[in-house]
Amino acid sequence: MPGLLNPDKPAIGRYTRRIDPIRNPYTPGAGSRPPALTGRDDEIEAFRILLARLKLGRPEKSMLITGLRGVGKTVLLNTFEAIAEEQGFRTAKSEITHETDFRPLIARLARRALLAVSPAKRMKERARRAAAVFKAFTLRTPEGLEIGVDVEAMLGRGDSGDLGDDLSDLFLALGEAAAEHETGIVFLLDEVQFLDRAELEALIAALHQVSQRELPLTLAGAGLPQLPALTGTAKSYAERLFRFPTIDRLSEQAARAALELPAEAEGVSYEPQATERILELTEGYPYFLQEYGKHAWTAAAGPTISLDDVERAHDLVQLDLDESFFRVRIGRATKAELAYLAAMASLGDGPYRSGEIAAALGRPGPESVAPTRARLIEKGLIYSPSYGLNEFTVPQFDAFVRRSFPPEAPS
């Protein structure tokens, strides 16, 4: 294949770069779409069915994807966005953070969605009504967003100060406007677990109202594994309103395809032992597959990636993961929280019992470290798969913690 090999390229660091690095197909990065999106067909098909039912005016559960860090939740949301737009839906997407003020955020998304449904100068009756409700809703936000439509705020709709009532008014008005214009609206929210309970209650209540009216408005969201429990705590009927597909590491077949197909498209192949070694090191996690593919490509001295290439790449992959994937997760952790994480990791593979973590810290019982545990869950570093148990939200995080933060001796 022309341009594939570059034999005159000088040695750089530990690698002799002879496969063109510009054509490296692997894309490690937050939310970066992999060149071969494998193992997610069921979730994509479920989303297509959701959209098809909305088009027919039939209620269907919204989707909240759950999974650990690095399994491709954001990639899947981006794929959903593209599918929705291809099918004529209007989309508005954002990411929730610890600092998110939800009311202004949802107002910005609503504005984007409404103007996509109908430009300001061509709004029909329902769209103008939605603009009036939006204007009332934003009276309660500090930003004073404008919609660009000469309408008065619809007092009594969206302006009560109760987020649940106001968001329901806004979503109903948006859904009616979308139906009038023969389209639909898909809100896409990432990191939904960072919403507080009141915000989550309001979002669920608003979607419930929309579903009861069979309006073409839905939510596709993503979050960490604790999300189903959080929604159930916020509203008891959440399980009847949402579908919670859990995505995890890829199957061996899907992982192999995610690794080998992008290289094959560029005329590069893997020795069988090289593929097996990468599958072993990555455990099938999509982000890790992209990292190893990227560095193995760079390490290769020819159009076949060998086991030796993978072993040469291993140290740099580990360094990249430590600095760009693992370490960034703990930037907001306190000394006490780091000690808790180190105690967890010292126990080996999870899940980890709260009592055993307390004992590793030299504390009398789980109650003594419960506040630290709660803060770590709130920050998205650990989650509780069941009562009294704890797990890291990041694959292979235990090994990183053992390398970087050895446990302190119990005092």
What is the role of each PLM region?
Residues 1-61, 123-126, 410-411:
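A short, basic N-terminal segment
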Residues 86, 101-122, 140-145:
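Conserved NTP-binding/hydrolysis module of P-loop NTPases
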Residues 255, 260-324:
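Amphipathic alpha-helical "lid/sensor" segments that cap RecA-like P-loop NTPase cores
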Residues 233-248:
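A short helix-turn-beta junction within AAA+ P-loop NTPase domains corresponding to the substrate/partner-engaging
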Residues 81-100:
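Conserved catalytic segments around the Walker B and adjacent sensor/switch elements
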Residues 4, 10-14, 23, 61, ...:
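C-terminal leucine-rich, beta-strand-based interaction scaffolds used for sensing/assembly
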Residues 59-79, 361:
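Walker A/P-loop nucleotide-binding motif
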Residues 154-225, 233-235:
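Conserved Walker B catalytic segment
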